[in-house]
Amino acid sequence: MDLQITRNIEQLIALLRLPEVQVSDIIEIHQKPFGLKLEVQGARLMLTSWLLESKSHDLDNALKRNQPERFNGLPQRIFTIKSQLFVSALCPEQFDAHQWFRLCQKQRQFLSQLGGGE
């Protein structure tokens, strides 16, 4: 993994005030009310968020509300796994920790509005 990506991941974890973890190609962190998965893909980062204790979700409603302008034009993939609603994006190569942080905040806000998280 590229040193710059490693440093950006460390900075993202600090910005989100998450517990320190060993940086690797795939990181999954659970800190209520959200789950976060970071996957390094070449020089890019796949950032995925979900509510840990989602009471229910409406995939159709989430898909309707998933508008590009909500995420500054960055396409989001909305999907479910075992009744959990996830939102995921492959970040552009030039994104840094602060841009990842803002995207993560937007994903969390989106999920909270749908599912009643914080």
What is the predicted function of each stretch?
Residues 12, 59-65, 102-109:
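Short, Φ-rich (hydrophobic/aromatic) sequence segments
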Residues 28-59:
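The feature represents the first ordered module of a protein
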Residues 82-105, 109-118:
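Well-ordered alpha/beta subsegment
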Residues 1-35, 68-80:
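Charge-rich, low-complexity N-terminal segments
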Residues 24-26, 42-46, 82-86:
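A generic structural signal for beta-strand entry/edge sites
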Residues 3, 57, 97-101:
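Ordered, soluble secondary-structure elements with a strong preference for glycine-centered loop motifs
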